[in-house]
Regions:
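Hydrophobic, well-ordered secondary-structure scaffolds
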Residues: 1, 19-21, 52, 199, ...
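Helix-hairpin-helix
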Residues: 3-57
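Peripheral, non-AAA+ core regions of ATP-driven protein-machinery
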Residues: 7-9, 28, 74-77, 213, ...
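The Walker A/P-loop phosphate-binding site
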Residues: 19, 38-43, 49-161, 165
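Amphipathic alpha-helical transducer elements in NTP-driven molecular machines
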Residues: 83-86, 99, 115, 143, ...
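Phosphate-binding/switch region of NTP-binding enzymes
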Residues: 223-227, 231-312
Length: 312
């Protein structure tokens, strides 16, 4: 539960927060459990102010029941299925990238993961008319390549719109990544920037680059940070009906990186690899985790100047 601090709600000033901490009130739970009359005597904070703060905190942090019919209608109204650039992959995913879900693409270096992300940007903006937040942790994003994919598929007048619909954020460690996700959350709540009114896809390319360094040395701290990151990603997807696409690597023995703990994060997991006995630009994609489609199903795609696409 959140700690009591200045500006946690509008009536908690620095002086109020200090008095509450002196009285042993450290969290919101501590506060709402206290008798307000006793707390007023102990802290010299006016009783009516304490009651008002309690009401504000309960409104901010409590869970309220929702009618099932209303919840269903809200879910239907906010749900989206975003198309990937590969038709066969859309069939494999039962339509595409679902909002409120995390889809992971894992593969070895140079298997085409970033190419797939860039191609998804073009397909989502051009087909679904939605905006994208692209969080780049390893310097793999290329505006020139994105423009090249867009130019090969669309008329020149659409190029500027494609580029303006993708907001790129650099994150060089796990703390910057969590900060970037928090910024997305804040902008979705505030609704001050028109760009975020149309955001439906968040891409993280890649999680491995920022999690692995934190797992070295003090492994328990690193594991805790990984769990914290996973919760932020899943909450962002669920709370704002966003589709989240994350990129992961594979280990030397072909297993997906980050172990069993991370395996519970994605709702869908795809494994991309170089296809045997095929052209160098052909990739095999296997569905290794899904709640909607048959696990083990696979398709072939190719990487061309147009990005990732169905084999012709």
């Amino acid at each position: 539960m959140s700690a009591i601090r200045k500006n946690l709600c509008s009536h908690i000033t620095e002086d109020v927060a200090s008095k509450l901490k002196s009285a042993g009130i450290k969290t919101v739970v501590d506060y709402v459990r206290m008798d307000m009359e006793h707390l007023a005597q102990e802290t010299t904070i006016p009783y009516k102010d304490l009651v008002l703060i309690r009401r504000l905190l309960l409104a901010q942090f409590s869970t309220f029941p929702v009618n099932c019919a209303d919840f269903y209608q809200t879910t239907i109204a906010t749900s989206s299925i975003l198309p990937t650039p590969v038709n066969k992959l859309n069939e494999l995913l039962d339509g595409g990238l679902y909002s409120s879900e995390v889809t992971e693409v894992a593969g070895e270096i140079s298997s085409g993961k970033t190419q797939f992300c860039l191609s998804c940007c073009v397909s989502v903006v051009s087909s679904a008319k939605q905006n994208i937040v692209y969080i780049d942790t390893c310097g793999g994003f290329s505006a020139d390549r994105l423009a090249g994919i867009a130019e090969s598929q669309l008329a020149e007048e659409h190029l500027e719109h494609i580029l303006q619909s993708v907001k790129v954020v650099a994150a060089h460690d796990i703390f910057q990544l969590m900060s970037a996700l928090e910024t997305v959350k804040e902008n979705m709540i505030k609704k001050e920037e028109p760009f975020y009114d149309l955001v439906k896809l968040v891409i993280v390319d890649s999680v491995t680059a920022v999690i692995y360094p934190s797992l070295g040395g003090q492994q328990m701290d690193g594991h805790g940070l990984m769990v914290q990151l996973s919760l932020k990603i899943k909450r962002l997807a669920a709370d704002f009906s966003l589709a989240v696409l994350i990129i992961n690597n594979v280990t030397g023995d072909g297993n997906v990186s980050l172990g069993k703990t991370w395996s519970h994060v994605p709702h869908n997991r795809l494994l991309i690899s170089h296809a045997r006995d095929q052209k160098p630009n052909v990739r095999e994609v296997v569905l290794v985790k899904s709640s909607k489609s048959a696990v083990g199903s696979k398709i072939m795609l190719e990487i061309t100047e147009k990005g990732t696409e169905d084999i012709k």
